[in-house]
UniProtKB/Swiss-Prot annotation:
This is Glutathione S-transferase kappa 1. One of its GO terms (cellular component) is extracellular exosome. The modification N6-acetyllysine is found at K71, K85, K116, K158, K165, K169. The modification N6-succinyllysine is found at K49, K116, K144, K158. Its main location: other. GO terms for molecular function: glutathione peroxidase activity; glutathione transferase activity. Keywords: Acetylation, Peroxisome, Transferase. The lineage of its organism: Eukaryota, Metazoa, Chordata, Craniata, Vertebrata. Glutathione binds at S16, P17, Y18, N53, L183, S200, D201. It catalyses: RX + glutathione = an S-substituted glutathione + a halide anion + H(+). It comes from Homo sapiens (Human). Belongs to the GST superfamily. Kappa family. The keyword Acetylation applies.
Amino acid sequence: MGPLPRTVELFYDVLSPYSWLGFEILCRYQNIWNINLQLRPSLITGIMKDSGNKPPGLLPRKGLYMANDLKLLRHHLQIPIHFPKDFLSVMLEKGSLSAMRFLTAVNLEHPEMLEKASRELWMRVWSRNEDITEPQSILAAAEKAGMSAEQAQGLLEKIATPKVKNQLKETTEAACRYGAFGLPITVAHVDGQTHMLFGSDRMELLAHLLGEKWMGPIPPAVNARL
């Protein structure tokens, strides 16, 4: 029997493109590194407010850098990420509250579907320039992730319940307690210690903390399938 997997938590919001990048890299490595990957749907607007941080859209130079950066990362990481056409509206007006409540409901009721459902919401907003705020948009993502129409509708009906609202609030507050000022954050629990890493570009450091080998963003086992 091999060593027990170490726990790594990923706090993320589908409104955050860098969360998608970190998510995919961790999904590629979770079996290679033998980690217990825990996905934590969170609300980036709550973290921004709590920390006093500002979104890139309010800082023009940062927004321009982000657009160029994601274009380069699309090819480097082989993730089909594209800037939304109406970036400011997506980030500052539409937001992701309903989507993140839906993913919270998925995590509570059908955690085995969380990875695919999260990916399909990212694909909508950060790859195909599609909506993630309307009920039909969320249902379309859920069904594309493999849920039945009835299952998806049942989960959607729970996003306004106190249980789901409170869980999303608690997860967001947990990220803040770890010191988050944005997303994604990766929290590694290793040898009785807890390490919080911000951003999608800290995976080499995560490998070091885990005592594992970093083989680039597309490890050989994954590259063979791409």
